[in-house]
From Swiss-Prot:
It is an enzyme of class 3 (hydrolase). This is Polymerase acidic protein. It comes from Influenza A virus (strain A/Duck/Czechoslovakia/1956 H4N6). Mn(2+) 2 binds at residues 80, 108. It comes from the Viruses. InterPro entries: INFV_PA, PA/PA-X, PA/PA-X_sf. Its cofactor is Mn(2+). Phosphorylated on serines and threonines by host kinases, including human casein kinase II. GO terms for molecular function: endonuclease activity; metal ion binding; RNA binding. Mn(2+) 1 binds at residues 41, 108, 119-120. One of its GO terms (cellular component) is host cell cytoplasm.
Amino acid sequence: MEDFVRQCFNPMIIELAEKAMKEYGEDPKIETNKFAAICTHLEVCFMYSDFHFIDERGESIIVESGDPNALLKHRFEIIEGRDRTMAWTVVNSICNTTGVEKPKFLPDLYDYKENRFIEIGVTRREVHIYYLEKANKIKSEKTHIHIFSFTGEEMATKADYTLDEESRARVKTRLFTIRQEMASRGLWDSFRQSERGEETIEERFEIRGTMRRLADQSLPPNFSSLENFRAYVDGFEPNGCIEGKLSQMSKEVNARIEPFLKTTPRPLRLPDGPPCSQRSKFLLMDALKLSIEDPSHEGEGIPLYDAIKCMKTFFGWKEPNIVKPHEKGINPNYLLAWKQVLAELQDIENEEKIPKTKNMKKTSQLKWALGENMAPEKVDFEDCKDVSDLKQYDSDEPEPRSLASWIQSEFNKACELTDSSWIELDEIGEDVAPIEHIASMRRNYFTAEVSHCRATEYIMKGVYINTALLNASCAAMDDFQLIPMISKCRTKEGRRKTNLYGFIVKGRSHLRNDTDVVNFVSMEFSLTDPRLEPHKWEKYCVLEIGDMLLRTAIGQVSRPMFLYVRTNGTSKIKMKWGMEMRRCLLQSLQQIESMIEAESSVKEKDMTKEFFENKSEKWPIGESPKGVEEGSIGKVCRTLLAKSVFNSLYASPQLEGFSAESRKLLLIVQALRDNLEPGTFDLGGLYEAIEECLINDPWVLLNASWFNSFLTHALK
């Protein structure tokens, strides 16, 4: 390759390339592909600027033969190929004389006609991939990007190709020639792959030393060496008679394998009983926000200051009254608790300087709501181990609940788009490896699909509430601290917005173990009338606290504003996971990625761009009684995200059990659909294991009903 480069490019280019590599401590004799790539890039930059001039009238002209009389100025300033110090000097002087914004990275050329810097790219991959890579790296609207490939493709910012057709054809022809010359010498494949960084790993590498000893120690019984075990595993025919295989593995197993046919599975039995109720730590679709746009008040960012500012945007407060009592609670206490919050916020405003945190007075209503002094007294085991009738409390079996329609509505709402963006595009450093570039391209596409999704709002709300509650639990263990429930977003126009959903009052929080519970009372604004679905609000006491004017198509209407109040609890470990809810974005992105990978391996090229930009294609989203639901790729992203977010919001032992056990049945059904003739033993036991998780949890019940829809359609 080195010989080829020295024959193929002129000496000036070779000298510049060697200098550039030396500057980065690289050796042209060793990194020959890099050497070739740098020479090619330099040559393209020079060809791009060759013969292009600006005449006395400031018009761009092409002059191929040197006319010494013409007063011509070069149209392009070449920056590439100069040493870094000199290059920056040129860039700075251009910026000073033209007033153009200074680029963050060194560009390749400056165009005096269009007054812009140009970044030239030469790629052995697809132009759009490399284009996005460049755009992501320089993150500047001002620098123009122009990419050429060795296959004659090109791509430029806003499809503005700067040069005339003929000049560009010269560049493309030269690149094509280089490619053919390389191919004829057998150099092209290695050169093409070196940009991708493709590597193959030897199938079976030798294990030596400590690793070898560990491998030998960790073999199953009856195997003398790793080779011995490997031979056994390799010879283990998977598609033989399963009963024989089982008995070969253990003498105690005697299983009768039953064939699993389309008629074998039955639907899961969902429990009967009163409808299930809302159990999330904060309101979801029913939440109402009091918001301020472009917050710039004193103390902006301090939750209490923000909350007071948001409260002041609402003028419809009225004397609160109970509209839906909590069946088991002392409802007047919930009412008094809200009045106390209002009064204490008023007190803060009357003070000279607003404090950063607010601890509530320990009134009887708050003590009751937070379960103060309710915990049974702990006695040392030594003192009571001789008590004859020592026994654990009898705990009631949970009452079975039936699936209610509200949880499906909650899920549908979580998949919808809001008119605000809840996450910023992460500032992640520039991509170094090609794989990183594909990753950031996928991340950017995915973020664009989910940044406005309501599930993303729930993530940010969950992260905020859990962080604030965990902080307060550690910092103010004995205090009843008032914690505003806040989120931040950006409007369509890009303006910042701070939202207040309501307040939490935290109880005593001496949390020694991960599972020790801190009680809290949540008070959340809403426009939902609880009397429409009273079963959903079983655990809440709901007050009517004001009237809100809403703009509708028919003009302004007044709607009652409600406050949903309940006692709740959480633990250190739950708050820790709540703070990490952003992981849901990652989980759903990985699921989308595996879809892209499947598509790409069929087409043998990266399909990210087509995957997200082909708006006409429909993808399966889920099963409903109507059949397989389909939607755009954006809808798939948002549905996967909502599922992940609900798994976090409604996390429970019932969900863990249901997910693990139902997956086994799912795999058997999939095998049947793929005509793999699955066999099963003790299918009844599997159904039992799944159904013992279907008790009263709304999210688990909804998943079970989806599972039944899937069974129906899968086995048609």
